[in-house]
């Protein structure tokens, strides 16, 4: 029965998970103070995302966050913790896009006693270890290609000379200079004698063995994207979880330092194993399977799996729990599992191999440590973002170096939750019920469905035969709709008005204004996974911050690497794969494509590529979305994107064979900052806006209009300010049934839009997140209005180019505009602001609303 706690949720005919379960046979009642009046629907109608009073929060998906225990602020994105051998020092590795750091915590008080900063390009990445005597500590350096080494004395760390991890020699290419391939050291562990370190090379599919005295190294291949390492049998064996695959590599380390370790076994576990922990006897290895939502129990004597612990929140639940970290109690009878997707810790009875309770955490727990009397939990995203009233950047006129970043990629502060052990049965039962409430498995089955039906005149969503899914780049709600005159906007933050976005703004006015819609992602790297598979897994979430901060990590998205496919089967994780499996027709225009030598665009995934228009350009700010705007900046630009789409759409108009779903990427609202010779930010947004207007006009004047819905959103909201939350973004739903002119303030997010489209075309939810999400049916009226839309030409459309004297033009010129988010996004935000508001215009001062409660009152630890 899943976690052994939650009974099967009731389901409606579409297969949507609704809110009606029991926990241990006891009905769960919604907490009015947390969820608001009116049950689940009331919560979704009136709450907003981000930090809330009392040390609680709401994630962009809509989950409530009520961390148990007392809370301590950590750094940006804590991903791992390690307890010293004597139990008196806890290390935390903070691996975010902003200031990375290594923190020392006193586990007896949960106080931070030391912080060692690592500003970019210096780096940390996941791995932490102590020598067996506790006198030396180690931290993996990720893109720095080294292991940081520290002397431990008096409860403090003193950094010593690092250990270097050799990069891989490049494959020679005649006539070229190929840089060495990166290893990107991640998880590590010391052997029992303390003489060697075993290091997982995350980007090199290998493990390096380092002699800590001489620095001598040897390397052995393992599986894809190894992440964590556990040594055993006195240092003679190492277990390596291959996060990008579904295996654990078993290494023989019995040779001396000069002997290359041997891979003696490969054990199949679940999909994308994130972490492992060995019991005290060394006979059982527990492995957290990130995209199988399970823990594999491996018999180390026989090197095979002897049991699987299901962590799903209810029977037959889709993926989304995302087990990320493990710890065993001192007596070995309890296994604690951080579930990053569900914001909880599962408490597992290791004898019965079943979940006996759940502990609510802050957002995205990644690591857990158990001492004799305390449970310590690292929460990577803490209480979330909240408003960022400056455009993702501190006030550039301020001389204070302490101004905190207001960029969504780095503004979230991680936290440490501390609870007493052992856990009392009544306490754990209350906490388990709280998790059920937080994540929507509470009483009042079908409450939100019925409320949505009432809002829609008592009818289900009209029959939609064709869906067109348009994804743009990186704008917040306030940037484009803040001055709309309706909805919850802040006019002072509106950068793109009717002069550059008349179609977007006009469609929002005449159809539906969604003023409580959030991007589930932080940036494009996880955004493109969220908009296509309703999730971004731990591989993606741990790597993109290093990629976005110049710390030598790859862009972990928009390719066919199975490591970031957030499903049990990586070949059936994306919406196009689900459509193909269900026999639904689809066509791709720009999603997950890259240019080829013949100047066509193709996807790596053969399922997607087979339905991709090769003449539709991918992301490239040199090429316009629409004709009649700016002149292409390079000769190799193909037909403007919407013009190519129109060519095929007109063919479907003639043939009558329009696919059930079209995916259309229109990226130029990303802009090219103030780069001299490139279009101004207003001109880029105008180009993008005109493309959208022309697409809507074509559909609304076609034979398909009566049963088509166009869904429009941004992949993320990272490039601007918003007075509600840094994740709030644009959403449009355009169909004859949505021309109502009303404001819909229902709590929606990316997965709500995906859920609505899935229902329309007849496929099941991909993950727990779109299964949970409220479909956007309240936006649809009873009657259809077939009046067509006529595209409006923005006044800013045309060859309005940045001059060499444009604000920050020189800095903008140093940035790469050929790939999404491959340049400094904080710089982008500042450049766009100054180009519109004036070179001397200060951005609004940041408002700090990351509300914390360090008293312990946010949770139940009594």
Where are the language model's segments positioned?
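Intrinsically disordered, low-complexity coil segments
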Residues: 14, 18, 171-177, 255-262, ...
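Compositionally biased, intrinsically disordered low-complexity regions
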Residues: 7, 12-16, 29, 216, ...
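Intrinsic disorder/low-complexity segments enriched in polar/small residues
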Residues: 6-11, 25, 115, 160
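Predominantly soluble domains enriched in secretory-pathway, periplasmic, or organellar proteins
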Residues: 36-452
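N-terminal pro-sequences and low-complexity stem/linker regions of secreted or lumenal proteins
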Residues: 428-862
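Secretory targeting and sorting signals
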Residues: 15-42
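Intrinsically disordered, low-complexity serine/threonine-rich segments
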Residues: 3-5, 78, 209, 257, ...
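Terminal targeting segments of Actinobacterial cell-envelope proteins
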Residues: 1-21, 664
């Amino acid at each position: 029965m899943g976690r052994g706690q939650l009974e099967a949720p009731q389901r409606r005919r579409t297969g949507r998970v609704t809110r009606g379960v029991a926990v241990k046979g006891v009905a769960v009642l919604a907490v009015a103070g947390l969820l608001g009046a009116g049950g689940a629907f009331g919560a979704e109608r009136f709450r907003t995302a981000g930090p809330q009073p009392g040390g609680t929060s709401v994630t962009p998906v809509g989950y409530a966050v009520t961390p148990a225990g007392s809370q301590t602020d950590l750094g940006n994105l804590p991903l791992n913790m390690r307890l010293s051998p004597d139990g008196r020092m806890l290390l935390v590795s903070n691996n975010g896009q902003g200031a990375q750091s290594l923190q020392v915590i006193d586990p007896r008080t949960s106080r931070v006693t030391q912080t060692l900063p690592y500003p970019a390009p210096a780096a940390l990445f996941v791995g932490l270890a102590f020598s067996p005597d506790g006198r030396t500590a180690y931290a993996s350096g990720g893109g720095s290609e080294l292991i940081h080494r520290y002397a431990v004395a008096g409860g403090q760390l003193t950094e010593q000379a690092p250990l270097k991890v050799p990069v891989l020699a490049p494959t020679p290419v005649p006539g070229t200079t190929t840089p060495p391939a990166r290893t990107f050291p991640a998880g590590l562990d010391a052997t029992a004698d303390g003489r060697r370190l075993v290091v997982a090379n995350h980007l090199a599919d290998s493990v390096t063995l380092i002699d800590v005295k001489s620095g001598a190294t040897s390397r052995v291949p393992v599986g894809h994207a190894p992440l964590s390492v556990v040594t055993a049998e006195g240092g003679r064996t190492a277990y390596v979880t291959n996060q990008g695959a579904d295996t654990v590599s078993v290494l023989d380390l019995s040779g001396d330092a000069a002997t290359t370790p041997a891979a003696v076994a490969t054990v199949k576990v679940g999909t994308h194993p994130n972490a492992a922990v060995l019991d005290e006897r060394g006979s059982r290895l527990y492995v957290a399977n990130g995209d199988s939502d399970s823990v594999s129990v491996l018999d180390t004597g026989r090197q095979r799996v002897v049991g699987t612990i299901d962590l799903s929140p209810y029977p037959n639940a889709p993926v989304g729990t995302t087990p990320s970290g493990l710890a065993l109690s001192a007596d070995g009878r309890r296994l604690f599992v951080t579930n990053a997707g569900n914001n909880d810790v599962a408490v597992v009875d290791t004898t019965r191999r079943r979940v006996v309770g759940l502990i609510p955490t802050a957002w995205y727990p990644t690591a857990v440590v158990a001492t004799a009397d305390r449970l310590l939990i690292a929460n990577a995203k803490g209480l979330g973002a909240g408003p960022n009233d400056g455009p993702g950047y501190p006030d550039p006129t301020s001389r204070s170096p302490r101004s905190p970043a207001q960029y969504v990629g780095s503004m979230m502060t991680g936290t440490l939750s501390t609870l007493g052990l052992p856990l009392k049965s009544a306490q754990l039962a209350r906490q388990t019920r709280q998790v059920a409430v937080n994540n929507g498995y509470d009483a009042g089955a079908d409450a939100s469905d019925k409320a949505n039906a009432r809002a829609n005149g008592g009818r289900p969503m009209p029959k939609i035969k064709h869906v067109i899914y348009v994804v743009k780049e990186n704008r917040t709600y306030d940037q484009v709709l803040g001055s709309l005159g309706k909805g919850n906007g802040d006019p002072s933050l509106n950068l793109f008005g009717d002069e550059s976005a008349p179609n977007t703004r006009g469609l929002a006015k005449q159809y539906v204004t969604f003023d409580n819609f959030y991007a589930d992602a932080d940036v494009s790297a996880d955004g493109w996974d969220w908009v296509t598979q309703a999730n971004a897994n731990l591989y993606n979430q741990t790597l993109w911050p290093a990629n976005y901060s110049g710390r030598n990590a790859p862009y972990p998205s928009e390719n066919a690497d199975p490591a970031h496919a957030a499903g049990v089967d990586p070949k059936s994780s994306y919406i196009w794969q689900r459509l193909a499996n269900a026999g639904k027709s689809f066509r791709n225009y720009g999603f997950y494509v890259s240019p080829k030598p013949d100047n066509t665009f193709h996807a790596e995934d053969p399922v997607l590529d087979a339905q991709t228009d090769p003449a539709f350009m991918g992301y490239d700010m040199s090429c316009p979305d629409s004709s009649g705007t700016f002149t292409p900046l390079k000769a190799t630009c193909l037909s403007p994107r919407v013009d190519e789409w129109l060519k095929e759409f007109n063919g479907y108009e003639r043939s009558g064979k329009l696919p059930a779903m079209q995916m259309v990427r229109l990226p130029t609202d990303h802009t090219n900052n103030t780069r001299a010779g490139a279009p101004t930010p207003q001109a880029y947004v105008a180009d993008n806006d005109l493309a959208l207007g022309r697409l809507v006009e074509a559909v609304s004047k076609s034979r398909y209009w009566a049963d088509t819905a166009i869904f429009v959103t941004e992949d993320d909201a990272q490039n601007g300010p918003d007075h509600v939350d840094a994740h709030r973004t644009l959403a449009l739903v355009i169909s004859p049934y949505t021309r109502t002119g009303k404001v819909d303030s229902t709590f929606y997010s990316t997965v709500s839009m995906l859920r609505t489209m899935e229902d329309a075309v007849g496929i099941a939810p991909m993950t727990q997140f779109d299964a949970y999400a409220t479909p956007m049916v309240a936006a649809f009226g009873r009657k259809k209005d077939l009046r067509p839309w006529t595209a409006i030409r923005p006044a800013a459309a045309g060859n309005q180019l940045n001059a060499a004297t444009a604000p920050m033009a020189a800095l903008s010129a140093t940035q790469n505009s050929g790939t999404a988010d491959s340049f400094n996004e904080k710089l982008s935000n500042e450049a766009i602001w100054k180009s519109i508001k004036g070179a001397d215009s200060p951005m609004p001062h940041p408002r700090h609303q990351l509300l914390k409660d360090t008293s312990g009152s946010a949770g139940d630890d009594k």
